[in-house]
């Protein structure tokens, strides 16, 4: 594989991993490294009503069979390796995904996942890059991590009113995510980071948007088309 294709491959894996990590959930979270354990996270430090809202959103996300995820960045996000945006349709059971990304200002670079294989379309040809398990980095694509790990340790929750996103009325909540969770999106993270979530107010408790401030830049993931049929073939 030439250097250009290898760079695109790595970038696609990271951004796809961010999408899957946000909404795919499993039964457990990986054990944090010793240096990350520090002071145990105490969710009781936050407003119980806001914690309940977060938990309901987690439960709703765990039940998804398909979703569309739009990834947008601001500033400098080194972990995405040149990708500044992506739009991905993801289906569970069996896992499949298809999308396009903007890589180093080149728009519309297609990629897909089928049968545990990931492919990227470069120079008008689809190239099979192998299985996700062989190509992905440790925790990014692990379905056992998922949204539960990303948001379950959030502290310092504060209500920030309401906001309409793509026609959906949402509750806006800010909080702090521990470094062990931030590493799902930024493997080099060493400290907790502020995050914001927007949760649908229509009774579905869908996670409409999540934004994580990584310091030099931020990653925003917006979900839509929950449980709608998606074309990932």
UniProtKB/Swiss-Prot annotation:
One of its GO terms (molecular function) is lipid transporter activity. Keywords: Cell membrane, Cell wall, Glycoprotein, Lipid transport, Lipoprotein, Membrane, Palmitate, Secreted, Signal, Transport, Virulence. It is found in: Cell surface; Secreted, Cell wall; Secreted; Cell membrane. It is a lipid-anchor. Pfam families: LppX_LprAFG. Modified by Lgt on Cys-27 with an S-linked diacylglycerol with a mixture of C16 and C19 fatty acids (palmitic and tuberculostearic acid), signal peptide is removed by LspA, modified by Lnt with an amide-linked mixture of C16 and C19 fatty acids, expressed in M.bovis and M.smegmatis. Hexose glycosylated in N-terminus between residues 27 and 55; there may be 2 sugar moieties in this region, expressed in M.bovis. Disruption phenotype: No growth phenotype when grown in culture, no release of phthiocerol dimycocerosates (PDIM) to the culture filtrate. Attenuated virulence, about 80-fold less recovery of bacteria from lungs of 3 week infected BALB/c mice. GO terms for cellular component: cell surface; extracellular region; peptidoglycan-based cell wall; plasma membrane. This is Putative phthiocerol dimycocerosate transporter LppX. It comes from Mycobacterium tuberculosis (strain ATCC 25618 / H37Rv). The gene is lppX.
